[in-house]
Every structure is written in C-alpha cells, then in structure tokens.
C-alpha cells in the first residue's frame, strides 16, 4: 500500500525512493489523472439522463387571477364586474413508449461511458509514461553528476602529477596548460550537469508530487512481449486508443437509431388533479376539484425537415466514427512499431556501449601507467581519460533510453497501467461510480418500460465494460513502500 497523499509543500515522513513508490503516488494524487476521473463521473450522468425519458414527471402549478370586466349598466349601477379566481393542481406524466428513442439513448450513453473509461486509461498511461521518464531522467542525471565529479577528481590528480613532472623538467609548460584547461572544462561540465539534474528533479516533483531522493535502480518492466508480433496482438485487444474509437462508433450508431425513432409514435399517460375557486373572500367550501386522466398518442408527420436533418447528421457522424476506427488502428500500429524499433536500437546501444566502456577503461589505465614511465604524453592521458568518460556517459544515456523505450512499448500495447505495474495499490474502479448513479431515481416498472421501448429500436450490442482482469503472465513486478491505505 502506498502512503497517503499530501500537498507538495507539506512535510512527508518518507520520500518515494523506488519507481513503484513514484508510480503509486502519481496514480493516486496526480491532478491531471484526478481531473480525468472527475470528468468521467460527468459522463456517467449521461446514462441517468437518458433513462429519464421513460420515467414519470410530476409538476405543480398555482395561479391567481384578478380581473375587472366593464359592464353596460347605467349609473349609478356598477360600471364593472370584479372577478378573482385561484387554482392549484398537480400533473403526472408517464411515457410508456417512444418508438425506441430512450432505449437507443441509453445504448448511446453506455457506449459514451465506456469510451470515456478508455480515455481515462489513455490519460493514466500518459501520466505513468511521464513518471517513468521523470524517474529515469533523475537517475540518469544523478549518475552523470557522479561521473563528472569523478572526472574532476581524476583530472585534479592528473594536474598535480603534471605539475610535479614540470618541476623536475620531465614535461613542458604546455603539458601543464593542457591539464589545467581540461580541468576547467570538467568544472564547467559538472556545473551544467548539476543544473540539468535540478531541472529533472523539478519535472519529477511536478508529475509525482514530491521531490526525489536518491532513487533506487529501476526494475525490469513486467509483461514485456518477446516479439513485436506479440506486441501487436496485445495492442489489438487492449490499446485504449483503438478501444475508445470503437466505443465512440457504437455511441454514434445508437444515436442514428435515436434520430430515426423521433419519427415513430409515442404513447404517454397523463393525470391531473386540481382545485379552483374564489380567492377573496376565501372559502374552502367554494373550491371545486377537477380530476382528469388521458392517454396521449403522438405521431409526427412533418417537422419542417428537423428530424430528417438529424438523421442525416447522425449517419454522417457514424460514418466518420467508423473511418476513425481505421485511423486509430493505424495510429496504434505506428506507435507499437516506433516504440519497438526505439527499444531495439536502445538495447543494442547498451551492448555496444558496455563494450566501449570496457575497452576505454583498459586503454586509459594503460596510458596512465605508460605516462608514469615517460612513454605517453600528458595529451595522450587526457584524451584517454576523455574517451573513457564519454563512453561512460553514453552507456548511462543508453540505459536511460532503453528503459524509456520499454515503457513506450507497454504504453503502445495498452499495458502501461498501475494494475499491470505495481501491487499493493488500491486501484480506481470507474464502474463503482457508475453503479452508484446507474439506478438513481429508479422505479419498479423501469425494466418493463425499457423492454417495451426497446421493441421499437434495433439493439446495439455492447460489452459490459469495467476493469478487465489481469491476463496471464501480467503479474505486476513492482511494489511500492508500505503505507496507509487510500481513503
């Protein structure tokens, strides 16, 4: 379990030292992710609003009337007649059938909810990609600063040795100047690296929610596919980009049915009870009661082209959404391909850079020994030292790029999510919020009217949605530090 969230400026008992801690904290407290979850609740309400089409409405009204009506009577008889009336009533309306319009609206709203959940998954993947990026950026820059500091120490020793040789006439003033110049350059590079580390720490704080400490090495990402074909297969099923496009098309398809249903007849019951009488002087016994009940059947014949226009617009939107599925599919293929290629090249760079570091270290150590006995010049030593440092820096960058690329592959597949990456974290389940409002203001006869109205519209097949179970082999490999459970 990860620690409770606090404001960035608030003191904390412990810092997120591992990648699992960082992911858990960002998953729980990142404002962008929290805002997206709140937005999803707005979409949930669209389903409730759609169902309201087959639920009763109750309205009340109260009127008061005062009127003076002129008379034709001669004076001194009254020249006007005063009338004051009051009335109050309650009207109850219940739609029994509206040609499948409400059933289609419910199907469209359900698909919109599911599409919004896929949008939330996309946001989560984006945030976690930023967390991984920020984490390994800090780790990279910490290692670079360490290499630069070590480089400064080595060059300081080299300058001392060169000066000692100069004192006894073994080297010239030029050798001393070369060592001094290299040391000055190393100081400047260290300052630059420290500045970059501060920038990376600020980025980490922004996305995770707290300042980084000395971060632990990142673990191997879980669930990495063995081949690019496996990555494509997973993305075809689990990519939120593709899933959202499909859900959006389902919604617009249901809206076509809803638009067509506007031309069908509707049946409603309406009942009214009211009282009316003289306001002044008020006498309850003078008020008469009126009770009416009626069945209303409505069949549109002509709407000025409104319904036809709505149908054409809905059809055009559904066509666009069906085309967008292919666009989303191509986007996913591109993302997986690019991420896989980047990962493959980065891993290859790690292998070659490791060999380069090994060879450069042997060369540097040999050059140092040969310099001590006069077989190498100061410049030879400085060049060998610079070659070794460049190789070490290249290896650090290669490790960084490979890990970011691996996270990119998981993101393109649709598996860069907390449920796949970490254990012991209370996962956000969007279905929980939806279930709370799904049957809000429900009535015992809702199911009967739903089935009756559905007879007027073709069914749009949709999945149940919700959080999918972890696939086999997708057990999270990381666990954040223990802490109090999420509220």
Language-model regions, residue ranges each:
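Boundary at the C-terminal end of the N-terminal hydrophobic targeting segment
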Residues: 7-9, 14-16
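Acidic, low-complexity, intrinsically disordered peripheral segments
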Residues: 12, 68, 396-487
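A glycine-/polar-enriched beta->alpha junction
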Residues: 24-34, 41-56, 90-107, 118-125, ...
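Membrane-embedded beta-strand positions of outer-membrane beta-barrel proteins
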Residues: 36, 58-62, 245, 267-271
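Transmembrane beta-strands of outer-membrane beta-barrel pores
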Residues: 64-70, 96, 273-277, 299-301, ...
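Outer-membrane beta-barrel translocator domains and adjoining extracellular loop/strand segments
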Residues: 70-77, 104, 217-219, 264, ...
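Residues that define the transmembrane beta-barrel architecture of outer-membrane proteins
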Residues: 84-86, 287-291
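Periplasmic alpha-helical coiled-coil/stalk elements that build and connect Gram-negative outer-membrane
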Residues: 126-236, 248, 342, 346, ...
């Amino acid at each position: 379990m990860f620690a409770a969230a606090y404001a960035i400026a608030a003191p904390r008992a412990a810092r997120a030292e591992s990648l699992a801690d960082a992911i858990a904290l960002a998953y729980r407290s990142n404002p962008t992710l929290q805002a997206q979850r709140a937005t999803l609740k707005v979409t949930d309400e669209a389903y409730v609003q759609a169902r309201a089409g087959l639920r009763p409405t109750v309205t009340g009204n109260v009127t008061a009337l005062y009127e003076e009506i002129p008379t034709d009577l001669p004076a001194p008889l009254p020249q006007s007649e005063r009338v004051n009336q009051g009335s109050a009533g309650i009207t109850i309306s219940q739609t029994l059938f509206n040609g499948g319009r409400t059933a289609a609206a419910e199907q469209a709203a359900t698909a919109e909810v599911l599409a919004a959940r896929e949008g939330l998954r996309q946001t989560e993947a984006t945030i976690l990609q930023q967390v991984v990026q920020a984490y390994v950026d800090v780790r990279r820059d910490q290692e670079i600063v360490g290499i630069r500091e070590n480089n400064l120490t080595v060059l300081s020793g080299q300058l001392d040795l060169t000066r000692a040789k100069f004192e006894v006439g073994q080297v010239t003033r030029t050798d001393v100047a070369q060592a001094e110049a290299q040391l000055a350059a190393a100081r400047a590079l260290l300052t630059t690296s420290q500045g970059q580390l501060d920038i990376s720490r600020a980025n980490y704080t922004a996305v995770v929610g707290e300042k980084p400490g000395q971060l632990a090495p990142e673990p191997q990402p879980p669930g990495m596919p063995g081949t690019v074909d496996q990555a494509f297969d997973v993305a075809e099923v689990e990519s939120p980009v593709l899933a959202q496009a499909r859900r959006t098309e389902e919604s617009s398809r249901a809206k076509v049915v809803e638009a067509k249903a506007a031309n069908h007849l509707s049946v409603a019951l309406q009942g009214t009870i009211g009282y009316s009488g003289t306001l002044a002087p008020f006498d309850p016994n003078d008020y008469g009661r009126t009770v009416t009940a009626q069945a209303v059947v409505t069949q549109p014949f002509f709407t000025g082209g409104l319904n036809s226009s709505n149908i054409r617009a809905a059809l055009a939107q559904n066509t666009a959404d069906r085309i967008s599925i292919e666009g989303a599919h191509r986007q996913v293929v591109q993302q997986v391909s690019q991420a896989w290629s980047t990962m493959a090249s980065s891993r290859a760079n790690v292998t070659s850079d490791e060999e380069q570091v090994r060879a450069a270290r042997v060369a540097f150590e040999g050059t140092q020994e040969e310099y001590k006995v006069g077989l190498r010049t100061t410049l030879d030593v400085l060049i060998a030292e610079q070659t070794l440092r460049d190789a070490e820096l290249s290896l650090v960058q290669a490790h960084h790029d490979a890990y970011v690329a691996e996270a990119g592959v998981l993101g393109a597949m649709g598996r860069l999510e907390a449920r796949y990456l970490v254990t012991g974290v209370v996962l956000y389940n969007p279905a929980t919020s939806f279930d709370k409002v799904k049957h809000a203001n429900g009535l015992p006869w809702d199911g009967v009217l739903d089935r009756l109205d559905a007879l007027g519209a073709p069914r749009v097949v949709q999945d149940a949605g919700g959080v999918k179970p972890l696939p086999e082999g997708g057990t999270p490999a990381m666990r954040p530090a223990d802490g109090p459970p999420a509220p």
